[in-house]
């Protein structure tokens, strides 16, 4: 889904169109989930944050400026809530339980292989490029790093994933 479509849906949501909100959710949920998961690495927590992201979108839609990058706005909300969740974990010393859950997750899906094989930064770059359609330049701006660095990390990540998938097939 391109940025204009997301912007149009957010504008409709601001006008009170609930059907537009449902379409927005359906079209953006996969990428948003993967983005949040890249921070939390726990399905249950990611699902909780996902609910909060879309609730926050609904409640704060009046703060969205029509004609801007709606995808970036959604991802910024997702990032903020994911980071809030991480800080809660630190306060509760939840780290050991998270490690246990992460070990229990099987490596059957692409997302799990990505999470296992790639660093957090590489995972975000691949997710933002493949699932969200961001250009390397845009990812560089979001992550405060040069476009060339994003491009080389992306290529290296894809090479790692190809190798991991070959090994998984054997």
Where are the regions that the model predicts?
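DNA-recognition helix of helix-turn-helix
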Residues: 10, 83, 131, 137, ...
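Structural recognition of an alpha-helix C-terminal capping motif at a helix-to-coil junction
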Residues: 34, 48-55, 59, 68-80
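Internal acidic/polar
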Residues: 3, 84, 88-116
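Short, charged helix-capping/linker segments at alpha-helix termini
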Residues: 14-23, 33-52, 147, 170
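N-terminal module of bacterial RNA polymerase sigma factors
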Residues: 1-31, 116, 142-143, 167-170
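Arg/Lys-rich amphipathic alpha helix in sigma70-family domain 2
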Residues: 62-66, 76-95
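Short amphipathic alpha helix immediately N-terminal
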Residues: 25, 117-138, 142, 167-168
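Sigma70-family region 2
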Residues: 14-15, 41-42, 52-69, 88-90
């Amino acid at each position: 889904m391109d940025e204009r479509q997301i912007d149009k849906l957010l504008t409709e949501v601001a006008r009170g169109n609930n059907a537009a909100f449902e379409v927005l959710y359906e079209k953006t949920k996969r990428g948003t989930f993967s983005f949040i998961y890249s921070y939390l690495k726990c399905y249950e927590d990611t699902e909780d944050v996902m609910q909060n992201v879309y609730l926050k979108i609904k409640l704060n839609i009046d703060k969205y400026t029509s004609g801007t990058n709606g995808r970036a706005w959604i991802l910024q909300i997702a990032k903020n809530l994911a980071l809030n969740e991480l800080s809660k974990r630190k306060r509760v010393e939840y780290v050991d339980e998270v490690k246990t859950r992460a070990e229990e997750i099987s490596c059957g899906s692409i997302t799990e292989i990505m999470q296992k094989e790639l660093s957090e930064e590489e995972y975000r770059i691949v997710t933002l490029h493949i699932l969200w359609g961001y250009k390397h330049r845009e990812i560089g701006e979001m992550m405060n790093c040069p476009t060339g660095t994003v491009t080389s990390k992306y290529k290296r990540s894809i090479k790692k994933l190809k190798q991991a998938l070959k090994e998984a097939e054997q």
